[in-house]
């Protein structure tokens, strides 16, 4: 706040202005002070402001030059407000460099070990991964596994969609990284021999894992996670079960990344 330096995040929006929660100073969307009880504010410096767009249930902030902000760069989250999809997720504060999370999300071989009880399986390690750069702003890694047993998480998903969970499946993982810090991962399984990734909806369960990362410091980040699915979208119990499962999975990542960050900080010359 331009008045006494209080965090404006503790304020509230009043009549289209942001009111400081300390002494009631109000600033407009440009950061200019407009009013304060019993105080002249014309000489107050501006609070810093940013280019902001609210879209798809998220607030997107461009921290650099406002003139360089391009809302067209915001990814198209096709499932938002779409009754054919269901979505839920959460937020973690993680004490690790955000780049460690990018590495984690783009190399899913760690699932075999970190997430052995849910989504991990040996075939992830055994199946070659393809990496490609698309245009100037997207890196894609993909892995397709055929005629394997579904891991526990995907068996649950198959059952929730009325599909047998005790038959071989084809599984896929397609990770899409767009700098600086968001990753969308297409994941799913289909009954083996039904077309895999391209199988008809009645033979598969598939989802989009949402990973949006806001770097905080050199050693910390805010991690927005979630899963959008296009099977049985109206069943709230399935949504809750998937969210619970994801929370456990990403908590395992949190533990690993925070300890990795600690080691990197303790042994910088390693």
Language-model segments: residues:
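Rieske [2Fe-2S] iron-sulfur-binding domain
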Residues: 2-86
């Amino acid at each position: 706040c331009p008045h006494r330096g209080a965090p404006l995040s503790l304020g509230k929006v009043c009549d289209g202005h942001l009111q400081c929660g300390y002494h009631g100073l109000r600033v407009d969307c440009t950061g200019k002070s407009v009013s304060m009880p019993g105080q002249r504010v014309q000489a107050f410096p501006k609070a810093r402001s940013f280019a902001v767009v609210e879209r798809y249930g998220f607030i997107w902030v461009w921290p650099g030059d406002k003139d360089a902000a391009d809302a067209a760069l915001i990814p198209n989250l096709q499932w938002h407000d779409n009754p054919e999809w269901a979505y839920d997720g959460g937020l973690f504060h993680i004490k690790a460099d955000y780049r460690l999370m990018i590495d984690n999300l783009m190399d899913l071989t760690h699932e075999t070990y970190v997430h052995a009880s849910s989504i991990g399986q040996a075939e992830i390690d055994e199946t070659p991964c393809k990496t490609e750069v698309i245009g100037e702003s997207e890196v894609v890694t993909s892995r397709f596994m055929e005629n394997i047993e579904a891991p526990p998480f995907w068996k649950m998903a198959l059952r929730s969609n009325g599909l047998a969970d005790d038959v071989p499946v084809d599984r896929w993982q397609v990770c899409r990284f767009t700098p600086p810090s968001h990753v969308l991962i297409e994941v799913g399984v289909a009954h083996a021999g039904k077309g895999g990734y391209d199988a008809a909806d009645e033979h598969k369960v598939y989802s989009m894992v949402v990973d949006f990362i806001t770097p905080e410091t050199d050693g910390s980040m805010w991690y927005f996670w979630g899963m959008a699915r296009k099977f049985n979208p109206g069943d709230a119990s399935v949504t809750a079960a998937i969210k619970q499962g994801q929370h456990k999975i990403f908590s395992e990542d949190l533990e690993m990344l925070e300890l990795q960050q600690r080691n990197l900080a303790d042994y910088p010359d390693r």
